[in-house]
Amino acid sequence: MKMELPLANKSLGQHFLRDSGVIDRICSDFKGQAEAVLEIGPGPGILTEFLALRSKSEGLPFFVIEKDDRFPPYLLQFINDNQITMTDALAVHLSAFFKEKNIDQKNIWLVSNLPYNISTPLLINFLQAPEIKYMTLMFQKEVADKVFPFSTTKNYMGSLLAITQTYFDCKLLCKVPPGAFNPPPKVDSAVLTMSRRETPLVPLSEFHALEKFLRLLFSQKRKQLGGILKASFPLPLIESSFNTLGIPLTIRAEALELNQVIELYRMLKK
């Protein structure tokens, strides 16, 4: 008999998924591709139970990282103690973690019902771990839309979209209403499924340089790009780059396409 679920900790952004259809869609992702599985923030093991069954049936190494010390007794219903690491996921150097667990040479699938209050910094960490080849992540809908705009036909470029899609191909797996959780959040959610590009648009070694450039580019979304960039780059270089791309200096960052953002980065970094 399973243990009764504890109360969710609001300060940690906890909302326990209870919709069996959504659980099944998440836990069935990347079949035949994943060679090892990491779950971040498993909580009382709602996804863990099914991920553990799948990992066992497919012979996949499976580990979880959890911060809340109330949850090991729940997790031990489904996995062993040596599969559980109790720490703050934001503080984990993922590549070192994978090496320690002897899965650094495998195609790793990362799964998480992300704590909504730290979903963006966690995602930024995940992007930088080359061992992670696949991700299935639950976001607050507003954040998911910034990673992969699925609720509008209009292109709204932003720094989170640009940095994520530089390294991963993204698509919507499913939308998730508040009633799918206990307690229900005040917002809608969405699950994105993400596959690492075989060749990233920008080398991972330049991640921080790209991140810095994107922060500048999107620092004042309503301001014209020519005005934003001239404080950091020579005007002749800006003008020649914009001419080459066929875009006006008066364009705003949110109107750019991803390929234009990347080309602008490449040209201006010279």
Language-model regions: role of each:
Residues L216-K270:
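C-terminal lobe and adjacent flexible extensions of AdoMet/dcAdoMet transferase-like proteins
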